[in-house]
């Protein structure tokens, strides 16, 4: 069995490959000792690691491991997944939305990191907790899926009520900017959490589009663990990308790009 692991700040993504078949699983980074214990009990012919906590795993296992830079691993793994899923892109920006968000440009040959922001899954969990007292990510994202942002976010169309706006009316003018106009509204946890996911998706998308225009590509690929159990985030990102004139791509198992890439970079 061959194993690739991306040990991130919040989640550890694990890919096992045997007989040309892959299996995927995740574990919370706070349970890294359990991952180490599991690895020490397996018969592994190749182990490849990436991510900020790769060194912690390597220091505590009884088998040799190779460690790779997470940006290179993510790019390698993403390229494999894009090809397997039928996406033939000459170049693209990819946004890796994990705890935070890292932005990269792939020119057809290699990747380069072109930016990063602190907005991502960490903000969804942290700000989401402050607004709802929910700590479980699945419960939080489940609750957000049917939330209504209309009384919370101020849209361009809310400002240009009786005239044609100079930009699309569905663009957000101010996240959370509609709240003071609806003080008698029922701001349910579901609505508040939907607004949090909205601001994360729109900020990530805006940054991705900005660098896409800088590098003259219309293709933006979104990956990362923040999309897990979060159809709303995916919809916000895809809709906003199209609204701003670019082409969004979502890759199945994209959160495991780093783990897959590390495995294929390994000798």
Swiss-Prot record:
InterPro entries per the UniProt record, alphabetical: ATPase_NBD (IPR043129), Type_II_PanK (IPR004567), Type_II_PanK_bac (IPR011602)
GO molecular function terms listed in the Swiss-Prot or TrEMBL record: ATP binding; pantothenate kinase activity
Chain's gene name: coaW
Pfam families: Fumble (PF03630)
Active site: 70
Record text on subunit structure and interactions: Homodimer.
Source organism: Staphylococcus aureus (strain MRSA252)
Name by which UniProt lists this protein: Type II pantothenate kinase
One annotated GO biological process: coenzyme A biosynthetic process
Superkingdom per UniProt: Bacteria
Function: Catalyzes the phosphorylation of pantothenate (Pan), the first step in CoA biosynthesis.
Residues binding ATP, per UniProt: 6-13, 99, 121-125, 137, 225
EC numbers for this chain: 2.7.1.33
One Gene Ontology CC term in the entry: cytosol
Family statement: Belongs to the type II pantothenate kinase family.
């Amino acid at each position: 069995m061959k194993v690739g692991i991306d040990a991130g700040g919040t989640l550890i993504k694990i890919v096992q490959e045997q007989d040309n078949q892959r299996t995927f699983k995740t574990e919370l980074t706070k349970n890294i000792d359990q991952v180490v214990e599991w690895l020490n009990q397996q018969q592994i012919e190749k182990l490849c690691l990436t991510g900020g906590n790769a060194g912690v795993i390597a220091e505590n296992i009884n088998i040799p491991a190779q460690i790779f830079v997470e940006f290179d691993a993510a790019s390698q793994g993403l390229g494999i997944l894009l090809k397997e899923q039928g996406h033939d892109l000459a170049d693209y920006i990819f946004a890796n939305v994990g705890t935070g968000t890292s932005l990269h440009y792939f020119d057809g040959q290699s990747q380069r990191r072109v930016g990063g922001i602190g907005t991502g899954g960490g903000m969804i969990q942290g700000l989401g907790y402050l607004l709802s007292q929910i700590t479980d990510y699945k419960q939080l994202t489940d609750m957000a899926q049917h939330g209504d942002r209309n009384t919370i976010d101020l849209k361009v169309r809310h400002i240009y009520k009786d005239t044609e706006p100079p930009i699309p009316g569905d663009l957000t003018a101010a996240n959370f900017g509609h709240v003071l106009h609806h003080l008698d509204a029922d701001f349910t946890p579901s609505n508040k959490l939907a607004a949090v996911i909205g601001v994360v998706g729109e900020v990530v998308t805006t940054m991705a589009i900005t660098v896409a225009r800088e590098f003259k590509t219309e293709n933006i690929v979104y990956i990362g663990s923040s999309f897990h159990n979060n159809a709303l985030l995916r919809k916000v990102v895809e809709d906003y990308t199209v609204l701003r004139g670019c082409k969004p791509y979502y890759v199945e198992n994209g959160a495991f790009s780093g783990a897959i890439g590390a495995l294929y970079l390994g000798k």
